[in-house]
UniProtKB/Swiss-Prot annotation:
<protein>
    <recommendedName>
        <fullName>MEMO1 family protein TGAM_1726</fullName>
    </recommendedName>
</protein>
<comment type="similarity">
    <text>Belongs to the MEMO1 family.</text>
</comment>
<dbReference type="InterPro" id="IPR002737">
    <property type="entry name" value="MEMO1_fam"/>
</dbReference>
<dbReference type="Pfam" id="PF01875">
    <property type="entry name" value="Memo"/>
</dbReference>
Amino acid sequence: MIRYPAVAGSFYPADDELILMLEKFFSDLGEEGSERRITAGVAPHAGYIFSGYTASRTYKAIFEDGLPETFVILGPNHTGLGSPIAVYPEGEWLTPLGSIEVDAEMAKEIAKLSGIADLDELAHKYEHSIEVQVPFIQYLTELAGKEVKIVPITLGIQDEDVSRALGKAIFEASEKLGRDVVVIASTDFMHYGPAYGYVPFRARADELPHRIKEWDFRLIRRILDFDVDGLFRELREMRHTMCGPGAVGTAIVYSRLAGAVEAELLHYTTSYEISRSTEAVVGYASIVMRR
């Protein structure tokens, strides 16, 4: 089974420009580490021109901490296709950088242990939130001369119960199979502006990024505190438009079970810094969780 790229050439380059872009993002990359303290990372999934540098901070930290055997990558289901909780079952994912293998054994175990997920490829066919993470992983594993596998999971339902069930299933599957795992939660933060039908406050253009950051940081503080209930409570109270809370909640639950004791915000920005448009502004954050 092969999953072909759906957004190469739009969200990220489909040609040699991709390597040049990744080289620029990782120009300050250190040596591959071996500590393996990082249990999970949060990374955005917009077009690389907007959020690629922010995403690279998550992967830089993971590389310098030590690459795992398997990346379990969770992202929201933007298309509505397929199963509500869909684990890609087996095969390979292709990008302009080549192919990466799905950890079929881990995928099947997560689906079975969760009690809520299905093995389903349709949900992934056109979804970008996971695909845009893959070239970062491929680039770094090529540098390290290693092979890693992925388990892609899309979330059409995102709440505390899903987060707990999936986080627990990923941990139990990793323990049962003896896998060294890092969970990636693919999410953007606030989607502000008339284009998104969400204008909870008004601000001058030069003040807008700061105001959006204030709102996003209410959620980021909950993430840094490993507070799943608080995260979803803030989301509901604010009617916040973060698109991957279930992915982040799952990463928190898994990380706690895996012994994580600290979380760090590595980078934050908004699309306004590039677009200078107030019609549609999105927040992006890079976060890692460590044992």
